[in-house]
Amino acid sequence: MKKSSIFLRLLALCLWPMFGYSQSKSGDAIVAGDGVAVTSTDNGQVRGYIHNGTFNYKGIPYATAKRFMAPEKPAAWQGIRQSLVYGAVCPIDPTTTVNDPIEFAFQHNWGYMSEDCLKLNVWTPGINDQKKRPVMVWLHGGGFSAGSAIELPSYDGENLSKKGDVVVVSINHRLNLLGFLNLSAYGDKYKSSANVGMMDIVSALQWVKQNIANFGGDPDNVTIFGQSGGGGKVTTLMAAPSAKGLFQKAIVQSGSYQTKFMDNEVSKKIGAAMLEVLNLQPSQVDSLQTISYERLSAAAKKALPKVAAQLKAEGKPIAGFGLGWEPVNDGVFLPYQLNDAAALELSKNVPLLVGSTKTEFMASLINPAIRNYSLDDVKTALKKRYGDKTDTYMAEVLKAYPNTVKPSDYMDIDLATFRPGVIRQANAKAVAGAAPVYMYQFAWASPVNDGMYKSVHCIDICFEFNNIARCEEMTGGGKEAYALAGKMSQAWVNFAGTGNPNAKGLPNWPAYTADNGAAMIFDNQPVVKYHNDAALLKLAAENK
C-alpha cells in the first residue's frame, strides 16, 4: 500500500470525530470526549455525548433575559461549548406536600436554582445526517409556578427519541412571579412582564425553528406537548400570535383546566399589591431587580390573598385553583381571551391530542383513611354530595368502569379537575373543524404500594415517554406496564409525525366529535368508547 494512501486513511480516522459522529458507531454505553457529538447552533458549536446510541445535549442556552423583561438571543460563544449536564431550574418555592409514599413514587429531582435558567435539552438518534425527524418539544408541569424539565425521571427524552426516531426537546423557563408579575403600569421597560414566562417558551420554539435541523430534526414538523401546567402552556401557545407557525401539532395531557386567561387589570392589581407589601413607591419599581427571590416570594404570599379578598368583596370570585401566577390577557402577547374566535382561529389547522387520567388528584391519596373505607363508608361519604342519587352515581361508575373493584374507586374518579375541561377543549377544537382532535383517558392502575397510586396525576408520562424502566417505583416495572408503554409511546410518536395517533396494537382510534364522543381508554387492553362517562359527568355537574 502506498504511503500516501495510508496517510489519507489515517487522516480520515483522525478527522472523523471532528464532524460529530452523525450516527453512533461505538458499542460502549457512553461515548463522550473531544470531537464527540459536536454540532452547530446559531450561537456556536455544542458538544454532547452519546448514551446507548442516542445523542444527548443538555443545558444549551436558547435565550437570556433580565428580570421581568422579554427574553433575548444569547451571546455567541467561541469554540465548542460543553452541553453534558442539565442547566439550572427557575427558582421556585419549597415544596410542602411531599411525603414518603408520594416521593417514593415520583422520585423528584429539584435540581439547582438560578434565574439564569433559559436552557434546553435535546435527545436525537442522529446529527448532521440530513434526516428530517419529527420534533417533540416537552413543556413540564407544575402549573405556571413550579416544576422544571428535570423534575421527574419520566421527563427524560432518550427512550422516546430512540423508540420513534424523533428528536425530543425539553426546556426550562421563568415561572411564578419571575415569569408573570405584571409591572407594565410602571414603565415601558416592563411592558412585557406579565407574560415573559410564556415568551421564554416562544423563544425556545424559535431556537428549535432555527437550529433543530443540525440535530437531525425537521423544523417544519414540531409537536408541542405538555402535562398538567405543561398542558396549560400548550393551550396558551395555541392562542398566542407570536407562536403561530412554530409548531404544527399539539398534545395536552391532564392540562385542560383553563377557562380564561387572567384579566389584565387584575394582574396589574397584583403588581401594585407587591409594591405595597414591599413598601415601595411606583418610582422605586426598579428596586425589584435586586431584591432576592425569597423576599419577593414572601411578599407574593401576602399580595395574592390581598387581591383575592378585594376581588371577592367586589363580587368577582376566583375560579379554578385560586388566584396565582398564570398567563395574562395583556392585549399584546395574548390579545385574545382563551376561547375567543380569534384565538381559536390561530391554531385551527393544528391537530390536537387531548386527555387526562382516570383518578388524577384522587381523594384516597389526599386522605389515606379512604383507602380502608367499606362500601357503606363510601356511600355515606358520597351522600353528602349526591344525596338520593348516590346509588345512581355508583351504578353509572360501574357502567363506565366495569373494572371498579375497591370501594375507594368510587371516590377517586376525576369528574371535576381535568376531565370536564378535556371535553370542553375537544368540543371547541372539533367545532373549528379544520384539523382533527383525538381524545384519550389513561385508566391503567399501578400495582405499587398495594395499588394506592391507581391512575394518579403524572403517571401517564412514564408511558408516553416509554420510560417504565426509569419509573419502576411508580409503575412496578411489570410486563403489562412495558406493553402499554410501547403502544402509547408509539401513538404519541405517530401523532407527532402525521397528526394521527393510530398505532399497531391499538384498536382503530377515530377522531373525536361532540356527536361521537370517541375516546381511547388506555388500560392493559386499550379500547375505544363513546360518551363513556357522560352520565357521570352530568351527575357531577348537577351535584357540586
Regions found by a protein language model. Give the residues of each.
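Active-site loop->helix "elbow" adjoining a glycine-rich segment at hydrolase catalytic centers
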Residues: 141, 196-200, 228-231
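Mobile gating loops/cap/lid regions near enzyme active sites that modulate substrate access
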Residues: 60, 419-544
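Substrate-access "cap/lid" subdomains that shape
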Residues: 210, 244, 253-375, 410-428, ...
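Bacterial Sec-dependent N-terminal signal peptides
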Residues: 1-31
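Alpha/beta-hydrolase fold nucleophile elbow
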Residues: 215-227
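Non-catalytic accessory segments of hydrolases
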Residues: 24-195, 219, 361, 475-488, ...
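Short glycine-enriched nucleophile-adjacent loop
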Residues: 231-243
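Alpha/beta-hydrolase active-site loop
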Residues: 117, 191-213
